[in-house]
């Protein structure tokens, strides 16, 4: 014990450490109680022995207050490593020898530090300068932050204003589009209501006619009611032309009557076409009276059952049949009048003039494709689109231009032929006149002057002929230049149309590439998501094997160890003789009597009790379970005294403050507390497992949602692909075919132009004849006469 007390810290040092470092003070609200006094030195000596000695050494040497720690750090910062001795002197203020040594070291340090005073001052000045610089930089950074925040606010305000303006514009455009759509819907609804009103008026008239009919019977009334029930479903037929915007509302009866009338009209047109060739301009019938008899319709099994049913149902109500036929006739008349308004009489006259002046029949121009009379007015019952490339407005214009050019060429050829004929007659007369003058030249003696005059006249005639030829060639060139300019303009239009189509093709290709990119991206994302969610169960199993399962195993091990520890405690309790360790008194005096020797009093009893306490502490340090209940009882006796003096109460408060450094030695309460902590840990880990399950469920739901989204994207992509393959690709092929056709037409026109350019001028109008001879013949005749006249003039 003496060796232990010599190495152990003194109670005075412990008390000074409590007051200075730990800030131990008297309890204010308990001034009158037993806990208001400072613990005595004897009480501190009782707890500073055994296993508590190294703990008190560690606490006194290592545990310092916040003020001391701050002072030590400041000294280290200012003085550096030279002040270690002063720090050492401030660490152990409880010992007298350390105080004297600290004073001597302070004197030596003061002597040595005089040489470093200037260095310290320089360091302090540098530190102050650095602090000022840091403060200045902080102010600069703070000011720049304020400027940056102000600029960010300004930018955000401008962005908000711009976004607001864009939103307002978008809202205005949206409202405008909605109003336009609503206006259009209102117009359509107005037209539909007007048609409904018209149809209702027709029904009212039909009902009035049915009531006023004299020959009405119950059968007719029943048939009318049945038909009216069947006619409750309307069929809407829109006009083929978008400009007319015709909406036709008709019942089932009227539709059937219209179909029958159309069929009868088509049969009548076919019969007239076959009977009268002049109907199509193919010939003239010599005996029209015989052909008239062919117009009679003799149906021998040609009427279909559907037509018979419609006719029988219509004949049950003759007034209604007549009204329907009249309405159909009025509609056909209106359509015919509209078609007649579209006809250009002047163009037709030019076409007929060109047709019959050139003694050949050309194809008629195609009718309007969108016309509802295309079947009746197209030749041989063909649809208007079948003859679209045979005759069109462009071809009609080409024929008109060709007719004008042919007419100009004909007039020019006729003028040239007439001039050549007049020149021939003049040359013949001149030749006859020159021969007469040649016979009499020897008489008159004036041959030289006459030959000069004739030479001048020939020169003048030659110049006039050349001028006329140049004039004609100039006119021809002007007409050809105009035609070529028109061809260039048409070719430019064709090139522009081809460029537009090519631009559409490029746009289509760009959209197709974008769709392909989107499709591949979605497919890749889908595959990645499928792979990720397929790996989730494995990852969850691995995570559980790494976290939850080991934690559960640890809990099981802790429970087993706690169970073993409880069994050891119980066995120790039963092994103790008469359970005397658990029957310790609850007062310090009784504790001293029970731990001391029987019959001993005074210091001997205290020494014997201290010896027994040291042995008990050693047993507890050796992990002997039988010593733990005694220590717990002693702690309870010290912490909850009954009528003790002030020193023992202060000792109990000190022990309460030192609970953080007393290691629990495994009492029943500690075991139960550990078991409760283990159970709480199990519950926490069960909650973690449930959270993991909920996360897995959420992940499964998210996977299903993502699969639905992916399926929707795939369906949308397939729909877009079908749209591309069904609509865009045929349109693209049609555009390419049209471009190829336009290119072929341009090549054909270029070939015609080259062919015309290679031909001589005399072959342009070789079919024109004057007095039975062509222009080339007359020109050759003129050349022969000129040569003969030159020969005769040379002879003379």
Curated annotation (Swiss-Prot):
- Assembly mode: Part of the augmin complex composed of 8 subunits. The complex acts on microtubules and interacts with gamma-tubulin in spindles and the phragmoplast.
Its subcellular locations are:
Cytoplasm, Cytoskeleton, Spindle; Cytoplasm, Cytoskeleton, Phragmoplast
InterPro entries from the UniProt entry: AUG5_plant, HAUS5
Reported phenotype of the disruption mutant: Lethal when homozygous.
What GO biological process, any one, is recorded here?
cell division
Annotated Gene Ontology cellular components are: HAUS complex; phragmoplast; spindle microtubule
Which protein family is named in the record?
Belongs to the HAUS5 family.
Source organism phylogeny: Eukaryota, Viridiplantae, Streptophyta, Embryophyta, Tracheophyta
Q: Which GO terms describe its molecular function?
A: microtubule minus-end binding
Q: Which UniProt keywords apply?
A: Cell cycle, Cell division, Coiled coil, Cytoplasm, Cytoskeleton, Microtubule, Mitosis
Q: Where is the composition biased (Polar residues)?
A: 80-92
Q: What stretch or stretches form a coiled coil here? A: 115-191, 462-501
**Which PANTHER family does the entry mention?**
AUGMIN SUBUNIT 5
Q: What does this protein do?
A: Involved in microtubules reorganization during spindle and phragmoplast development.
Descriptive protein name: AUGMIN subunit 5
Q: Which domain of life is it from?
A: Eukaryota
Which organism encodes this protein?
A: Arabidopsis thaliana (Mouse-ear cress)
Name the segments for region: Disordered: 79-120
Instruction: List the transmembrane segments.
Output: none
Principal location listed in the UniProt entry: cytoplasm
């Amino acid at each position: 014990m003496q060796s232990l007390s010599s190495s152990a810290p003194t109670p005075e040092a412990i008390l000074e450490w409590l007051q200075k470092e730990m800030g131990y003070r008297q309890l204010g609200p308990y001034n009158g109680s037993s806990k208001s006094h400072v613990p005595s030195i004897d009480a501190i000596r009782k707890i500073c022995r055994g296993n508590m000695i190294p703990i008190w050494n560690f606490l006194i040497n290592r545990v310092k207050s916040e003020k001391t720690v701050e002072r030590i750090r400041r000294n280290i910062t200012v003085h550096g490593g030279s002040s270690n001795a002063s720090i050492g002197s401030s660490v152990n203020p409880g010992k007298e020898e350390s105080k004297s040594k600290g004073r001597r070291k302070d004197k030596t340090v003061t002597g040595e530090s005089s040489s470093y005073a200037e260095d310290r001052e320089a360091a302090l000045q540098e530190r102050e300068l650095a602090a000022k610089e840091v403060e200045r930089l902080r102010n600069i950074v703070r000011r720049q932050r304020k400027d940056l925040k102000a600029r960010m606010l300004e930018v955000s305000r401008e962005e908000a204003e711009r976004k607001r303006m864009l939103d307002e514009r978008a809202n205005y455009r949206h409202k405008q589009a909605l109003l336009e759509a609503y206006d259009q819907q209102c117009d359509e609804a107005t037209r539909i209501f007007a048609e409904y009103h018209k149809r209702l008026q027709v029904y009212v008239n039909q009902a009035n006619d049915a009531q006023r009919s004299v020959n009405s019977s119950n059968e007719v009334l029943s048939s009318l009611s049945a038909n009216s029930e069947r006619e409750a479903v309307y069929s809407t037929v829109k006009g083929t032309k978008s400009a007319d915007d015709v909406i036709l509302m008709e019942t089932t009866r009227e539709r059937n009557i219209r179909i029958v009338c159309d069929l009868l009209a088509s049969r009548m047109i076919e019969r007239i076409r076959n009977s009268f060739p002049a109907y199509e301009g193919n010939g003239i019938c010599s005996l029209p009276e015989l052909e008239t008899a062919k117009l009679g319709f003799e149906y021998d099994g040609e009427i279909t059952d559907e037509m018979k049913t419609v006719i029988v149902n219509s004949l049950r109500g003759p007034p209604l049949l007549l009204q329907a036929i009249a309405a159909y006739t009025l509609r056909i008349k209106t359509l015919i009048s509209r078609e007649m308004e579209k006809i250009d009489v002047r163009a037709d006259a030019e076409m007929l003039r060109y047709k019959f002046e050139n003694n050949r029949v050309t194809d008629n121009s195609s009718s309007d494709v969108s016309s509802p009379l295309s079947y009746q007015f197209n030749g041989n019952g063909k649809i208007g689109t079948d003859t679209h490339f045979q005759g069109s407005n462009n071809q009609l214009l080409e024929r008109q231009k060709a007719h004008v050019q042919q007419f100009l060429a004909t007039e020019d050829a006729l003028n040239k032929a007439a001039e050549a004929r007049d020149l021939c007659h003049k040359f013949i007369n001149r030749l006859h006149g020159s021969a007469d003058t040649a016979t009499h030249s020897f008489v008159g003696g004036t041959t030289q002057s006459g030959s000069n005059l004739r030479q001048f006249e020939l020169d003048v005639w030659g110049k006039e002929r050349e001028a006329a030829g140049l004039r004609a060639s100039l006119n021809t060139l002007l007409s050809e230049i105009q035609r070529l300019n028109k061809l260039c303009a048409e070719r430019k239009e064709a090139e522009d149309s081809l460029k537009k189509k090519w631009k559409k093709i490029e746009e289509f290709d760009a959209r197709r590439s974008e769709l392909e990119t989107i499709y591949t991206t979605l497919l890749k994302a889908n595959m990645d998501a499928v792979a990720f969610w397929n790996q989730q169960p494995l990852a969850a199993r691995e995570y559980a094997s790494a976290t939850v399962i080991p934690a559960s195993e640890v809990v099981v091990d802790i429970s087993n160890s706690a169970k073993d520890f409880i069994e050891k405690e119980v066995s120790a309790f039963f092994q103790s003789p008469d359970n005397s360790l658990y029957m310790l008194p609850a007062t310090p005096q009784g504790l001293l009597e029970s731990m001391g020797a029987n019959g001993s009093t005074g210091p001997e009893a205290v020494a014997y009790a201290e010896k027994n306490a040291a042995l008990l502490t050693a047993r507890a340090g050796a992990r002997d379970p039988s010593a733990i209940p005694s220590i717990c009882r002693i702690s309870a006796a010290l912490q909850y005294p009954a009528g003790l003096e002030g020193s023992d109460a202060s000792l109990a408060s000190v022990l309460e403050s030192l609970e953080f450094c007393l290691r629990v030695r495994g009492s029943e309460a500690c075991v139960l507390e550990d078991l409760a902590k283990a159970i709480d840990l199990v519950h926490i880990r069960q909650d973690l497992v449930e959270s993991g399950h909920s996360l897995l469920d959420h992940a499964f739901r998210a996977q299903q949602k993502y699969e639905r989204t992916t399926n929707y994207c795939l369906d949308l992509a397939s729909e877009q692909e079908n749209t591309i393959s069904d609509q865009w690709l045929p349109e693209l092929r049609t555009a390419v075919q049209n471009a190829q056709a336009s290119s072929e037409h341009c090549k054909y026109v270029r070939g015609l132009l080259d062919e015309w350019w290679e031909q001589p001028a005399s072959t342009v109008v070789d079919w024109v004849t004057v007095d039975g001879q062509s222009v080339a013949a007359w020109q050759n005749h003129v050349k022969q006469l000129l040569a003969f006249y030159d020969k005769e003039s040379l002879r003379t």
